[in-house]
Regions:
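Repetitive, compositionally biased segments used for assembly/scaffolding
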Residues: 2-159
Length: 159
């Protein structure tokens, strides 16, 4: 039987281009450009530049450089979530922190590349290592998340 992830691009539960309810270009309620509650530039509670407790650059317990339990190079106890392209190619991995509001993103070589902060509306905002907002992650209907850039383009999914 073929790998179901290989068919993600053709699966309306995952692909937002096939499902308007999970497509931020069609559904303004899930698009941070139109919904100020999930936009970190308009809601400082979900902006790690203002809410230091959500910032792994400033909070040692969330920083994989300072907390080896969060670094997949140093521990085997990580969540095991994978970041994939829309074509189901491996982009990297996701580590859940003890603080459920923060996820850490790593590339295929297990280098820390970004972090994501819970937007309190079943999604996360993605920030690069410098703390700049680069995109967002929204729940899909297959039990995972879809990743988008700031323009709302689908860049991948997490399972």
């Amino acid at each position: 039987m073929p790998n179901p992830l290989a068919r993600a691009k053709h699966n309306a539960s995952i692909n937002p281009q096939l499902n308007p309810s999970i497509n931020p270009k069609v559904n303004a309620a899930i698009n941070p450009n139109f919904n100020p509650w999930i936009n970190p530039t308009r809601n400082s509670r979900i902006d790690p530049k203002f809410n230091r407790s959500l910032n792994p650059l400033l909070t040692a317990s969330l920083n994989p450089v300072r907390n080896c339990l969060l670094d997949p190079k140093q521990t085997r106890k990580f969540s095991g979530l994978c970041r994939l392209t829309p074509e189901s190619e491996l982009l990297g991995y996701v580590v859940r922190t003890r603080q459920k509001a923060v996820l850490l993103f790593f590339d295929k070589d297990l280098n820390w590349t970004a972090h994501a902060v819970d937007n309190s509306r079943e999604g996360y905002n993605v920030f690069d290592r410098e703390g700049d907002w680069k995109g967002y992650v929204l729940k899909n209907q297959a039990g995972g998340w879809n990743e988008f850039n700031l323009e709302g383009d689908w860049t991948g999914f997490i399972v």
